[in-house]
């Protein structure tokens, strides 16, 4: 169905599961140079090390937090009002925007005055903004003029993850604090493939990366609710979660719920890919309640306006859709301007043809009119709209391969070169750009994608869907793609678009969203570790220490999904007493490798020898015992 008939604005409620704090976690904030720069983090409490393992303190660990106010018990959440306008003062004080009387798009006006929509409409009292005549309000424009915005300072604090605070608490944790700090901050050298990864992120570094075009800050002036974040290969690898209704499934309430669920588990951005009848209203509810950037594919809604007939699309309809969505607050648009008429014949010999919805829409339009795409021909006009609201481009890969068979072919790379050319056009207008990538690519062919993207697109951030490394696993494509995502993230991709188990099969539900998010958080973190991102190993080291010390609850809570970890453990060892046991059900009490290792260490300490000598001594003792018992391999019992 197109909209849930039970959804009424007056009775809309937040998903209770999305607002509960994660186990042993609390929301903490770091304040910047001004009191309204308050950067949120999640702090995970840890138990002390048991006395038999040394009895030391384990300070709380800070992790990146995308959940916004939802997991803060001090926050009052009412999705009917939306989130606080965190950035309003920052936008207003720049003095380069004007408040409009109301929506200026034809469609926006039509929806606002339709009485049939009153019961489901979000009651936004705030009119939209637009750049003043002749002004440019993009973060890139400010960056290129040497301005460090509050958004940039916010991001610098956020990316550093309070590492200095953690170091100080480790050092102050006890007499061996310095030793503990050195141990827990240890990290293997990475291979960054040319990425520049400073030991600490400064606001000036953020400004430089945005000015250069190597990073983007998706932050529409009409989405003041967002907590600023950055996408770029010299920063933490980010992930995107796709949500959205269709003509046959889901409604407004479900999509808002999916959004809050996605950000709870780590979605850095969310794309609303709704294709049903109430796209406009669904998007408004999502944006007003989202602390993360929201992306869309405007051609989907434009197609709905012509009853799904691609050949009837016009520039005027598309332009009105861009303005409509920009005034709602969409932070980035996927626009398939690289699907050009000359490239379409290149897909003729493909196994799976054109699999991108946006790409196929534009290919059909080009063939129906035998004309160049209006997205390509009107690209500079699109840039004028983007810079009036600070909407970032996500230049779509409409010719991405839909199977390993089609990977790295002529059509894919012809489009990539065009996206590089369009990037230069957008940058001329100081419009922020990231480039979308494949798709389905076998592992040995992934690196070429990254290398060519850096070459053709002048290091603009790469944003990839996977890629899926094999085509044989419907129902498990979060895994087939997670493999490729980890690799391409290591090579330099800045943001990974998640794939859920339902990929190619159906619309994902809440469980699928979580499965996709966790899979891609693993891929992104693995990429950060492989690149050698400063501090990336801290959480791994803390969890490994907890595991060796049999601090079961800390193991669960330091992980990406505490609920599932605890559930799996409790299936066989459910009692509270088992949370302090020195074994799990995998090996049992007598064969736990970590317990055996600890026994060796205890023996070494008692004998006053090294662990190596203790092992050798133990082997000699067993050899003597073997000979005394007759040197028989087997004994009858």
Swiss-Prot record:
Sequence positions that bind substrate: 242, 271, 300, 336, 356-358, 397-400, 436, 463
The keyword Lyase appears for this protein: yes
Binding annotation for [4Fe-4S] cluster: 584, 587, 592
Keywords: 4Fe-4S, Iron, Iron-sulfur, Lyase, Metal-binding, S-adenosyl-L-methionine, Thiamine biosynthesis, Zinc
GO CC annotations, alphabetized: cytosol
Oligomer and partners: Homodimer.
Stated name of the protein: Phosphomethylpyrimidine synthase
Organism: Bordetella parapertussis (strain 12822 / ATCC BAA-587 / NCTC 13253)
